Amino acid sequence: MFMNSMLRVSRQRAAVRSTVSLYRGFVSASIRRNEQNVVKAAAQELANAKEPSDLIGPGGRDGEVPTDLEQATGLERYELLSELSGRDAFDMKPLDASRKGTLTDPIMVTSLDPYRHIGCTGSPSGSHNLIWMTVYKDKLRRCPECGSVYKLKFMGDPNAEHSH
């Protein structure tokens, strides 16, 4: 009795698997036949990158290990191309810690988003432990330890949609 039910189940599974594998083989074969091989040259300088597909590297040549620039794609490639052209892609330099920001003369923080996370270590730099804060567009933010004031300078597109 048990053996008969096991044989019946195994026959059903075998039938389903063969149907699925035939279907998958047929679908992928038709896609491969209709696919056109369009090879586009990758941008080697930031000025030549006009659209997101330009930020896909060419990859390594056969038999060679690719360099970072050949292999990088997307934001990593954008950062590498920016460094080659002498620009700081993501504005990673530290904030001005030579002075304290005041309500009339705050320390300006640039951002492409309507907010940015910053860390304050006081003025002069290192005078207190690191305190993390979030600075929002159109609002001043004061460090609770040293009293330095920060303001966000929004440089992004105000009509941009969030993509997540």
From Swiss-Prot:
Q: Which Gene Ontology CC terms are recorded?
A: mitochondrial inner membrane; mitochondrion; respiratory chain complex IV
Residue interval of the organelle targeting sequence: 1-33
- GO MF: metal ion binding
Cell compartment(s), UniProt: Mitochondrion inner membrane
What is the membrane topology noted in the UniProt record heading this document? Peripheral membrane protein
| Any Pfam family hit | COX5B
Q: How does it assemble?
A: Component of the cytochrome c oxidase (complex IV, CIV), a multisubunit enzyme composed of a catalytic core of 3 subunits and several supernumerary subunits. The complex exists as a monomer or a dimer and forms supercomplexes (SCs) in the inner mitochondrial membrane with ubiquinol-cytochrome c oxidoreductase (cytochrome b-c1 complex, complex III, CIII).
The protein depicted here goes by the name: Cytochrome c oxidase subunit 4, mitochondrial
Organism for this UniProt entry: Schizosaccharomyces pombe (strain 972 / ATCC 24843) (Fission yeast)
